[in-house]
Amino acid sequence: ALVIARAFVEAAIARKAAKLRAEAVVMDAIAAAGDSPILELPMGMPFRAAIDRAGADHLLFVVHPRDTDWAITGIRRDPEGFALRADLPEAWAGLTDAAFAAASGVPGARFCHNGRFIAVAADRPAALQLAALAVQDAETVQQAR
């Protein structure tokens, strides 16, 4: 029983340590982003708590590498709901590959979810370009309100 209890405690400590390391990486990335509404992370990791803790309300999208491509993710307004600070452009919703690349004007654009909360690009330059276009679109949508 002691061995099992020890394993549970060690696992909990390891999870907490990993969470703290991830939060430190996100905090450094927030500092590096400055006033940019785009947060670039070195890998996929939990980011919401660090963004809240840093008071980084200006951030709209997170860009990070995945196994073979890059993701552009919207940031939720609050931890409880699904509403985003900014949606990806409506014109991209549900598009893939050539259709997405044509609609966005970005070679390497691969996929945008119908819900407009995540898009995928072939590489970092394409992901950053899509994120910049999404910010421009979000600003236009905001001004129209």
PLM region spans:
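C-terminal accessory domains and tails appended to enzymatic cores
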Residues: 1-145
